[in-house]
């Protein structure tokens, strides 16, 4: 078999080239070409085509049942961002800065889902004992939560087929490894191929799968940009680690609106919902103070009251300077 040659793949648009470019010919971005090993293929498409079979085509009026059956997570703010709950067979990508609370919110959701569903939590970053310690701290006591400490997607796929869980959580996609890819875990090729495998599982078995994704130094999702095109929903968990409040925002949602946000507060026993963000924004605001006012902004279907402050001082420069800062 011929030796595989490395290729250069753009992390933004997925453009592939046999040589390195400083500027991607596909999207025009700079310094986005990374060296990767292509996926090994034992046989060509022409050789495989003889084994393909036709599949019956369904007409739209022949599809019966609830095509958008949703599962509640038990967290109203999370359901709001998802568009009313989890859609069966959907692939959801949850991304955010390290330590922001991605694994925490998903483990808390397992407590409610475990009342009526079997949840499989796959971790490539923590051992089963470490997940148990975090679950005890968060008060997660459900017996319908299976833990699998594994990074090989082939083993994970076979486990899902045998266990037949109702919901699957992958933490995280950057730690998963596909044997057909020669590159290391977290590379562009590995992330893309592993995500495609999980997408196939979700659609074939009707199992909703949550995927935790890391972010790069620029704040974008680590890995190829095509990752966001593969999944059904992209959620960002935002917030400053020095502050206790977190905002869950939907960037892409094939089954709902992307205008909704969810507000949470990080407490000692996990994340708590903030059902009235306006009260949070205006708490402790002094009355009858000059230079401040209350403004109403729309986030999805609900209005939020926020305080706007203005400060004017004399300047020694010829051109006045205008600056703004947002603080939650």
What are these regions (language model features)?
Residues 220-230:
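Short regulatory helix/loop adjacent to the ATP-binding pocket of P-loop NTPases
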Residues 6, 25-29, 33, 39-43, ...:
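Conserved P-loop NTPase
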Residues 327:
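Conserved small/polar residues in nucleotide/adenosyl-binding loops
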Residues 32, 98-100, 125-129, 137, ...:
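Conserved nucleotide-binding/hydrolysis micro-motifs of P-loop NTPases
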Residues 2-5, 16-92, 114-121:
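Detector for small/aliphatic-rich hydrophobic stretches
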Residues 189-210, 214, 230-241:
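Substrate-engagement module of ASCE P-loop NTPases
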Residues 89, 97-100, 107-197, 315:
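Conserved inter-motif catalytic segment of the P-loop NTP-binding fold
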